[in-house]
C-alpha cells in the first residue's frame, strides 16, 4: 500500500500542546492506564521493543500522560516504517534523534531534497558544453552548484543526527551519496578557482541525488529489481556474446577474402557488424557483398539470426520474466512480514499494564492522532470498530494486524435513499426513474456502442477521402453535429438518471464526459474559425475506446494498462536517469566531433555529407542530416540517445563518432545498447507479470470482485456518538472534531435515528490481490516468521555485558529486517 504523504507532514506538527494533551476517560471508552516499562505488558517475540521514554529520557516525576503521548508517537513511527519499508535499525533511538527524524520525514524536507537534486541535474544545461540560449558564466554555475551541494550537506547532517554515526555508515545508499557529494564538492571548488571547466565525467553521478529523494522511491525499487535480475541476465548475455564471437571468427575466415566486403575484413569489424546485425539495423546490407559473390553465404546470416535473435534473445526475456516473478513474490513476502513486525512493535507500545490483553479505544485514538493526523474523530472510531472483529472493548493483536488496510478507508455516511430523486414529487420521480431504468438497460448500452462504431467507420471513410494539405473544412460537417448531439443527449440522460455524484464516480463516464466536452470545444473552434484550436477536432476518434468495454479481455487489458501507468512513469524516470548519465559521458568525450562533411573517410560518409552544386540557374543542396545527431549539449544528447534506443540506423551515429575519435568509442554505444536492453527487458517483464497476474486472479475470483473496490459497512449508535463527543469535550479536543461529531448528532436527530450506517471505501490494490492469490502460502510465511522471532528472542535473552545499558542510552530494536 502506498504511503499517504500528506500525513507525514503533520507528524511534526502534532507536538503542540493541544494535540499532546492526554484525553480524559469517559464512559468507558478509555481509562488512564500506565504504559508498561517497555511499552507492552506481554512477553513475546517483541517484548524488547524500545521506547523513547525509557531510561534517562523520561524523568521519574513525569506524568503518565507524557509517557503515553511518547508511546503513541513512537508506535506511529513504527507503523510508518512498516508502510515505507524502512529498516528498523534506522528507528530514532532517543529524543534528540526523534526531533531530527520528524524534520527529515515531512514534505518540506522532501521538497528540499527534490528541488536540490533537480537543480544539480539542470546545471548541465548551463555548464560547458551548454545549450546556447542557457549558457552561464563559469563562476555563476559553479556558485549554484556549491549552494546546492551545501544544501545536500545539511540534509546529510540531519540524517546523521537522526541515525547516529554507526547506523549512518551502515546505510549503503547514504554512504554512496556522501562519496559522490565529496567528489562533486572538490570538483566544484576546482572549477570556481580555475574559472574554467575541465573534463567532469563524474557529473554523470549526480543522478544519485535524485534517486535518493523520498518522492523517487519507485525509481529505487526499479533499480533494485534491475540489479537483482542481473545475474541470470548476465548468464544469457555471456552465452549470446559467446556465439557472436564464434560467428565473428567464422565470418572473418569465410568473407575476409572478398575485397569488396568491408564488414568482415578484420576480426574487429566482424564482431562489431555482427553486434549491429543482432539489432537488425544493418540487415541485409551486411549480407549483400558476400551474397552477391556466393548465394550460399546467406545460410551463415540466417543461422546466426535464428540462434541469436530469435532463440537467445527470447530466452533472455523468458529468464528475466521468471526471475522477475520470483522477485515480485519475494518482495511481497518481505514487505508483508516487515509490516507484520512493525504492527507487533506498535501493539506492544500501546497495551497497558492494567490491560495487557489488547488496545483500548483511548490508546488507539492516541495512536491515530499521530499516524493519521488528518483523520477526524468519527473516522478514528469507525476505524476502531472496523478493526475490532471480536466486538470486545479491547483490540487484539490479531485484529490490529489489519491496521494498514482499514486505516486507508474513506468513510462516508450511507444514504437512506437509493436514488438521488427519491424525495422528489411523484411525477418528477417517475420521470427520473424511467430515465434511470433506460440508461442502465443493456439495450441502451448496445445502442450507444452501435453509434460509436458507426461514428468510427464514418470518421475512417471521411479521412480516407481527404486529400493532403488543409484537411480542416471551413464549415461544420453535418455528421459532426449529429453524433455530437447523440453524445450530448446520452450525457444529460446519464446525469439525470444516475445523478451527478454517481455519474462522475465511474472512470468510463469521466472519459465519456471529457471526450464529449472536447468534441463540443472542437465544434466551437470550427464555428468561430479558431485555427489554433483545430487540433481538438482530431480527438474525436477517442470515442472508439468505449468499444473496448464490450469484451472482457479488452477490459482486462485496459484495466491493467491504467494500473501500470504509475509504475510505468517510475520506469520511464529510471530510463531517464540512465540517459542522463550516458549523455554526460557522451558530451565529455564526443562534444563538437560531428559536423557536415565530417566523416568523408568512413563507410557512412553519405549520411554526413553536405554539398552545394548548381544545376542551371538553381543551387541544389544534397544534405545528410546525421550530423544533427550529436553530443554538443544535453538536449541534443538526449535526442541522440533516444535514436540509439530505437536502434534503426544507430550504427551510422556510432561509425560517425568512431571515425572522428577512435575505435574504442564503439564501447560507449555498445554498452548503452546493452543497458537499455536490460531496462527494456525489465519493462516488458513487468507488463507481462502484471497482465498474467490479473488474468490468473480474474480466473480465481468473480469479475465483480476484481473490478470493485473494498467496501466495509459499520454502524455507529447514538450512545457511542455521545460518548465520543463527551470524551473530546472533556479532553479539549480540536474544534473541527467536535463540530463534525455535532453535525452527525444533529443529522441523527433530524431523521429520528438511533444509529447511522457508514461505508468505508478504498480502491483494490495489487497488495489486496496478492493477499488472496497467496493466501495458502501466507500462513506458512507467518509460522516461519514466528519461529524466527522465537529463535531470535532466545539468542537475545542471554545476558551479556554489551546488553547492559548506560544512563541516557536506549535499547536497540531487535527486530528481524
Swiss-Prot record:
Intramembrane bits: 264-287, 631-654
What protein name does the entry list?
Two pore calcium channel protein 1
Ranges per topology, Cytoplasmic: 1-101, 159-172, 222-235, 320-445, 502-504, 551-574, 693-817
UniProtKB keywords: Calcium, Calcium channel, Calcium transport, Coiled coil, Endosome, Ion channel, Ion transport, Lysosome, Membrane, Repeat, Transmembrane, Transmembrane helix, Transport, Voltage-gated channel
Query: What functional role does this protein have?
Result: Intracellular channel initially characterized as a non-selective Ca(2+)-permeable channel activated by NAADP (nicotinic acid adenine dinucleotide phosphate), it is also a voltage-gated highly-selective Na(+) channel activated directly by PI(3,5)P2 (phosphatidylinositol 3,5-bisphosphate) that senses pH changes and confers electrical excitability to organelles. Localizes to the early and recycling endosomes membranes where it plays a role in the uptake and processing of proteins and regulates organellar membrane excitability, membrane trafficking and pH homeostasis.
Q: Which residues lie on this side of the membrane: Extracellular?
A: 123-137, 194-202, 257-263, 288-298, 467-480, 528-535, 596-630, 655-671
Q: What is known of its domains?
A: Each of the two internal repeats contains five hydrophobic transmembrane segments (S1, S2, S3, S5, S6) and one positively charged transmembrane segment (S4). S4 segments represent the voltage-sensor and are characterized by a series of positively charged amino acids at every third position.
Annotated membrane topology: Multi-pass membrane protein
Localization (cell): Lysosome membrane; Endosome membrane; Early endosome membrane; Recycling endosome membrane
Predominant cellular place of this UniProt entry's protein: membrane
Instruction: Outline the segment boundaries, as ranges, of region: Disordered.
Output: 22-66, 785-817
Which residue windows are transmembrane per the record? 102-122, 138-158, 173-193, 203-221, 236-256, 299-319, 446-466, 481-501, 505-527, 536-550, 575-595, 672-692
Q: What interactions and quaternary structure are annotated?
A: Dimer. Interacts with MTOR; the interaction is required for TPCN1 ATP sensitivity. Interacts with STX7, STX8 and STX12. Interacts with JPT2. Found in a complex with LSM12, TPCN1 and TPCN2.
Protein origin, superkingdom? Eukaryota
Provide the species name.
Rattus norvegicus
A GO molecular function term, named singly, is: voltage-gated sodium channel activity
Q: In which tissues is it expressed?
A: Widely expressed. Expressed at relatively high level in kidney, liver and lung, and in the kidney it is expressed at inner medullary collecting ducts.
Residues annotated as coiled-coil are: 770-794
Q: Name one GO cellular component term.
A: endosome membrane
- Polar residues bias (residue ranges): 802-817
Catalysed conversion reaction: Na(+)(in) = Na(+)(out); Ca(2+)(in) = Ca(2+)(out)
The family classification in the record reads: Belongs to the calcium channel alpha-1 subunit (TC 1.A.1.11) family. Two pore calcium channel subfamily.
Known activity regulation?
Na(+) current is inhibited by ATP in a MTORC-dependent manner. ATP sensitivity is independent of PI(3,5)P2. Probably regulated by Mg(2+) ions, cytosolic Mg(2+) selectively inhibits outward current while lysosomal Mg(2+) modestly inhibits both the outward and inward currents. In the absence of Mg(2+), NAADP readily activates TPCN2, with properties similar to PI(3,5)P2. Both current elicited by PI(3,5)P2 as well as NAADP are inhibited by tetrandrine.
Q: How is it modified after translation?
A: N-glycosylated.
For this entry, list what GO says about its biological process.
endocytosis involved in viral entry into host cell; positive regulation of autophagy; sodium ion transmembrane transport
Amino acid at each position: 500500500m502506498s504511503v499517504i504523504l500528506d500525513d507525514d507532514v503533520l507528524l511534526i506538527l502534532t507536538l503542540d500542546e493541544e494535540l499532546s494533551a492526554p484525553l480524559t476517560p469517559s464512559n468507558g471508552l478509555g481509562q488512564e492506564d500506565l504504559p508498561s516499562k517497555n511499552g507492552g505488558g506481554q512477553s513475546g517475540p517483541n517484548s524488547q521493543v524500545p521506547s523513547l521514554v525509557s531510561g534517562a529520557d523520561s524523568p521519574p516525576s513525569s506524568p503518565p500522560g507524557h509517557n503515553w503521548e511518547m508511546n503513541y508517537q513512537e508506535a506511529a513511527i513504527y507503523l510508518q516504517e512498516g508502510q515505507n519499508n524502512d529498516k528498523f535499525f534506522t528507528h530514532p533511538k532517543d529524543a534528540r534523534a526523534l526531533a531530527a527524524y520528524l524534520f527529515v520525514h515531512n514534505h518540506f524536507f522532501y521538497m528540499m531534497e527534490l528541488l536540490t537534486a533537480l537543480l544539480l541535474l539542470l546545471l548541465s544545461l548551463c555548464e560547458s558544453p551548454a545549450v546556447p540560449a542557457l549558457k552561464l558564466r563559469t563562476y555563476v554555475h559553479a556558485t549554484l552548484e556549491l549552494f546546492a551541494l551545501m544544501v545536500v550537506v545539511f540534509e546529510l547532517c540531519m540524517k546523521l543526527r537522526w541515525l547516529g554515526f554507526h547506523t549512518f555508515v551502515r546505510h549503503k545508499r547514504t554512504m554512496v551519496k556522501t562519496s559522490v557529494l565529496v567528489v562533486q564538492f572538490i570538483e566544484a571548488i576546482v572549477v570556481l578557482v580555475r574559472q574554467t571547466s575541465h573534463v567532469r565525467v563524474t557529473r554523470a553521478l549526480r543522478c544519485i541525488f535524485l534517486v535518493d529523494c523520498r518522492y523517487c522511491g519507485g525509481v529505487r525499487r526499479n533499480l533494485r529489481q534491475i540489479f537483482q535480475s542481473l545475474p541470470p541476465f548476465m548468464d544469457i548475455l555471456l552465452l549470446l556474446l559467446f556465439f557472436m564471437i564464434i560467428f565473428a571468427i567464422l565470418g572473418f575466415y569465410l568473407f575476409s577474402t572478398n575485397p569488396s566486403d568491408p564488414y568482415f575484413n578484420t576480426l574487429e569489424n566482424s564482431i562489431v557488424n555482427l553486434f549491429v546485425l543482432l539489432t537488425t539495423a544493418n540487415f541485409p546490407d551486411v549480407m549483400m557483398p558476400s551474397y552477391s559473390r556466393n548465394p550460399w553465404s546467406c545460410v551463415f546470416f540466417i543461422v546466426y539470426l535464428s540462434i541469436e535473435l530469435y532463440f537467445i534473445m527470447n530466452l533472455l526475456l523468458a529468464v528475466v520474466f521468471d526471475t522477475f516473478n520470483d522477485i515480485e513474490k519475494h518482495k511481497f513476502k518481505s514487505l508483508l512480514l516487515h509490516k507484520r513486525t512493525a504492527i507487533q512493535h506498535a501493539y506492544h507500545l500501546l497495551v497497558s499494564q492494567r490491560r495487557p490483553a489488547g488496545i483500548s479505544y483511548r490508546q488507539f485514538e492516541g495512536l491515530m492522532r499521530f499516524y493519521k493526523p488528518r483523520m477526524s474523530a468519527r473516522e478514528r472510531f469507525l476505524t476502531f470498530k472496523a478493526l475490532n472483529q471480536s466486538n470486545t472493548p479491547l483490540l487484539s493483536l490479531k485484529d490490529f494486524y489489519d491496521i494498514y488496510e482499514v486505516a486507508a478507508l474513506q468513510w462516508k455516511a450511507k444514504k437512506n435513499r437509493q436514488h438521488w430523486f427519491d424525495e422528489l414529487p411523484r411525477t418528477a420521480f417517475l420521470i427520473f426513474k424511467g430515465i434511470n431504468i433506460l440508461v442502465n438497460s443493456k439495450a441502451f448500452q448496445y445502442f450507444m456502442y452501435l453509434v460509436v462504431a458507426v461514428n468510427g467507420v464514418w470518421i475512417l471513410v471521411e479521412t480516407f477521402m481527404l486529400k493532403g494539405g488543409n484537411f480542416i473544412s471551413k464549415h461544420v460537417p453535418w455528421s459532426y453535429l449529429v453524433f455530437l448531439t447523440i453524445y450530448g443527449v446520452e450525457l444529460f440522460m446519464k446525469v439525470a438518471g444516475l445523478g451527478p455524484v454517481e455519474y462522475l464516480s465511474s472512470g468510463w463516464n469521466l472519459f465519456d464526459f471529457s471526450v464529449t466536452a472536447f468534441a463540443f470545444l472542437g465544434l466551437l473552434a470550427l464555428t468561430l474559425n479558431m485555427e489554433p484550436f483545430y487540433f481538438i477536432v482530431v480527438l474525436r476518434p477517442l470515442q472508439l475506446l468505449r468499444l473496448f468495454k464490450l469484451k472482457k479481455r479488452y477490459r482486462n487489458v485496459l484495466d491493467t494498462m491504467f494500473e501500470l501507468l504509475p509504475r510505468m512513469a517510475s520506469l520511464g524516470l529510471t530510463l531517464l536517469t540512465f540517459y542522463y548519465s550516458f549523455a554526460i559521458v557522451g558530451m565529455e568525450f564526443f562534444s563538437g566531433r560531428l559536423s557536415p562533411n565530417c566523416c568523408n573517410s568512413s563507410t557512412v560518409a553519405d549520411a554526413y555529407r553536405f554539398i552545394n552544386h548548381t544545376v542551371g540557374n538553381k543551387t541544389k543542396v544534397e544534405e545528410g542530416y546525421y550530423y544533427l545527431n550529436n553530443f554538443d549539449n544535453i538536449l541534443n544528447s538526449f535526442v541522440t540517445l533516444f535514436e540509439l534506443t530505437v536502434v534503426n540506423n544507430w550504427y551510422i551515429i556510432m561509425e560517425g563518432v568512431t571515425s572522428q575519435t577512435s575505435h574504442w568509442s564503439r564501447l560507449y554505444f555498445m554498452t548503452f545498447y546493452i543497458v537499455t536492453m536490460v531496462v527494456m527487458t525489465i519493462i516488458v517483464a513487468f507488463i507481462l507479470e502484471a497482465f498474467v497476474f490479473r488474468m490468473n486472479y480474474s480466473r480465481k475470483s468473480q469479475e465483480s470482485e476484481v473490478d470493485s473496490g473494498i467496501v466495509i459497512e459499520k454502524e455507529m449508535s447514538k450512545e457511542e456518538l455521545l460518548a465520543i463527543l463527551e470524551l473530546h469535550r472533556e479532553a479539549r479536543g480540536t474544534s473541527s472534531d467536535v463540530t463534525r461529531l455535532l453535525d452527525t448528532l444533529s443529522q441523527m436527530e433530524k431523521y429520528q435515528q438511533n444509529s447511522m450506517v457508514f461505508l468505508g471505501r478504498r480502491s483494490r490494490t495489487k497488495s489486496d490481490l496478492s493477499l488472496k492469490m497467496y493466501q495458502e502460502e501466507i500462513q506458512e510465511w507467518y509460522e516461519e516468521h514466528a519461529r524466527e522471532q522465537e529463535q531470535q528472542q532466545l539468542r537475545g535473552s542471554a545476558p551479556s555485558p554489551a546488553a547492559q545499558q548506560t544512563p541516557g542510552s536506549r535499547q536497540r530494536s531487535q527486530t528481524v529486517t
